Amino acid sequence: MDSLLKKQRQFLYQFKNVRWAKGRHETYLCYVVKRRDSPTSFSLDFGHLRNKAGCHVELLFLRYISDWDLDPGRCYRVTWFTSWSPCYDCARHVADFLRGYPNLSLRIFTARLYFCDKERKAEPEGLRRLHRAGVQIAIMTFKDYFYCWNTFVENHERTFKAWEGLHENSVRLSRQLRRILLPLYEVDDLRDAFRTLGL
C-alpha cells in the first residue's frame, strides 16, 4: 500500500484525461470501501494503489480486499477512481471475483479508456463483461476529480482547478464508453420494457 495521500503533481499527471497519454505506463487506483447499513453507509477504508512489477493494480486490490473478513450478511460498496480502465484480463478477474461476493458492489470511474490490442477488441469486451457483472462504469468528470483531489491528494488546501480540455475529453470518452456498452444498454432497455408490459 502506498502512502495515504498522493502528491499533487503525480495525481495531475497520471489522471489527466488527455487524448494521447504518452509516458503513462502505470495504472493508479484510488478507492473507497463503504458498508451499507439501511439507507446510510459507513466508510471502512480509503487509499490508493498503483501497479507493481508483474501485477496490475486491479488484482492488487482484489488481493487486498480478499484478506478482509467481509460479513456475508452486510452489503459493501467499493468505488474505484482509476487512471486507466481495466485491461481484458483484469476485467475478467474482477467479474469472477464479484460473482463470489454477491453482497459487494463496484463502481469504477476512470480517467481514460485502455486499449492495448485494437485488432482483438479484447478491452471493450472486458468492459462489457464488467457491466454484465453489475459493475457501474463511468468516465471521470470534474466532480470526480474534485472529490479525488479533496480525498486522496496532499493538496495543501489548494482548490482543484480543471485543465484545458477536461470537460471536452470527459464528454468524448463518455460517448466512446457508451458506444462500447450500448448493445448491453439496449438489451437492458428491452428487458425493462418487457417487464413493464408483464411479458
UniProtKB/Swiss-Prot annotation:
Region described as Required for interaction with RNF126: spans on this chain: 88-116
Gene Ontology molecular functions: cytidine deaminase activity; RNA binding; zinc ion binding
Catalytic activity: a 2'-deoxycytidine in single-stranded DNA + H2O + H(+) = a 2'-deoxyuridine in single-stranded DNA + NH4(+)
Single GO cellular component term: P-body
The keyword Repeat appears for this protein: no
Pfam annotation, one family: APOBEC_N
Binding-site positions, Zn(2+): 56, 87, 90
Subunit structure: Interacts with CTNNBL1; the interaction is important for the immunoglobulin switch activity of AICDA. Interacts (via its NLS) with KPNA1. Interacts with PKA/PRKACA and PRKAR1A/PKR1. Interacts with SUPT6H, TRIM28 and NCL. Directly interacts with MCM3AP; this interaction may favor AICDA recruitment to immunoglobulin variable region genes, hence promoting somatic hypermutations.
Protein name: Single-stranded DNA cytosine deaminase
Lineage: Eukaryota, Metazoa, Chordata, Craniata, Vertebrata
Gene from which the chain derives: AICDA
